[in-house]
Amino acid sequence: MNSISETSPEPIYRWVIVSASALMLALSMGMIVNGTSVFFIPLFDEFGWQRGEVSLINTSGLVGLAIGGIFMGRIADKTPIHWVVLFGATVIGLCMLGASQADALWQFYLLFFIAGFLGAAAIFAPLIANVGRWFKTGAGLALGIATAGQALGQGGMPYVLALLI
């Protein structure tokens, strides 16, 4: 008797999933992790805040991501992943829109915490889990490519965002 892997090869479509995941991770993690660094000097100049205060905006997003990952991973186990990721992308977009209108430090802290907790966390953990599900063998390579997107986004997003200033 043949095993499933011998009779039906894994679909090529799985590499589309890996590529799309890498792109989504690049955009979301690039924005939450390093994207805010581009706006530090404009925030210093506009509001007169101290470096530590402005840096805490980034920290609040990362803390939100760390805590939210636990909850969003669990939700992704019970909900179709595409809905969780769509929700996360929408939250990040709305939080960035809100941040463009914010004029108090606490508003930035709150918006970036929410963007991390409900946004980036709803993208990171579910996408990584989803990529792994598409591979019976070679999951390590696929996960490496997907997470490389995250690293490229963290390095490249500041340059892209600098064009907006």
Residue locations for each model-derived region?
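Extracytoplasmic
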Residues: 13-56, 72, 157-161
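Hydrophobic core of transmembrane alpha-helices in multi-pass small-molecule transporters
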Residues: 25-27, 95, 106-122
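Residue-level signature of mid-helix packing/kink "hotspots" within the transmembrane helices
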Residues: 34, 62-70, 155
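Intracellular juxtamembrane helix-capping segments at the cytosolic ends
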Residues: 43, 119-135
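Helix-breaking motifs and short loop linkers at transmembrane-helix boundaries and internal kinks
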Residues: 48, 80, 101-106, 136
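Helix-to-loop junctions at the C-terminal end of transmembrane segments
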Residues: 68-81
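Primarily marks hydrophobic transmembrane alpha-helices of the MFS/SLC 12-helix fold
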Residues: 82-85, 108
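C-terminal ends and interior cores of transmembrane alpha-helices
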Residues: 90-103
